[in-house]
Design a protein with these regions (language model features):
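Short, conserved loop/helix-junction motifs that constitute active-site signature segments
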Residues: 30-31, 77-78, 99-103, 137
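Conserved donor-nucleotide/metal-binding helix-loop-beta segment in metal-dependent transferases, i.e.
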Residues: 90-123
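Short glycine-/acidic-enriched loop or helix-start segments at secondary-structure transitions
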Residues: 21, 47-49, 93-97, 146
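Short beta-strand-to-loop acidic/aromatic patch adjacent to the donor-nucleotide binding site
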Residues: 80-92
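N-terminal anchoring/stem segment of glycosyltransferases
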Residues: 1-67, 73-82
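Catalytic core and acceptor-binding pocket of nucleotide-sugar-dependent glycosyltransferases
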Residues: 129-181
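Generic structural signal for small/hydrophobic residues in well-ordered secondary structure
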Residues: 36, 88-89, 138
């Protein structure tokens, strides 16, 4: 059994609950996390691993609600030095590949495509690392929005120019739009 005591596994889900339960349960196979938590407004789902804590959140009714919650509220569910946020389509499948040196970083996320007109930080530099769908985040990083003013802006700045969709992506906020903070 792999022991990862410094990481809290997190799933935030009000949609696709059966798939979310599968992802959490799979991510807990052969791993002992510092904590594992299923965050939802729908109640503790059936079939959830008994070692996973259920914590109630306000209803997540849109992608903007999800992104807002990740930026400003995930911190309230983490007491370890890091968290691993997973999704129904992005979860742990090879726990033996864990490397404790990853805990030296504030954020590790899957790469975005290489697009010179997208994923730009405030200096116009393309940032490829940041996809939040399966991401390791330090508690220090999660605490930043409560310590400084991190604005909730939609379609502002170079990161959002290519989207023009009225959406706010928490991973883009962390890794590009407000990277300088």
């Amino acid at each position: 059994m792999q022991k990862i005591p410094d990481v809290t596994l997190l799933m935030l889900a009000d949609l696709d609950i059966p798939d979310a339960v599968h992802a959490v349960n799979k991510s807990c196979e052969d791993i002992q996390w510092g904590a594992a938590k299923f965050l939802s407004s729908k109640g503790r789902p059936k079939g959830l691993n008994p070692n996973v804590d259920y914590e109630e959140v306000y209803p997540i009714q849109s992608i903007n609600d999800f992104n807002f919650y990740c930026i400003y509220n995930l911190r309230n569910h983490v007491e370890t030095s890091h968290s691993l946020l997973i999704h129904p389509d992005g979860y742990v499948i090879r726990p033996w590949l864990w490397d404790n040196t990853w805990l030296e970083y504030d954020y590790i996320g899957a790469p975005w495509r290489d697009d010179p007109k997208a994923y730009l930080d405030p200096w116009g530099k393309n940032q490829r690392v940041g996809n939040g769908g399966f991401s390791l985040r330090s508690k220090k990083l999660l605490d930043v929005p409560s310590k400084v003013t991190v604005p909730w802006e939609v379609n502002v700045g170079n990161f959002y120019k290519h989207m023009d969709a009225g959406l706010y992506n928490e991973d883009g906020n962390i890794c590009c739009h407000n990277r300088h903070i």
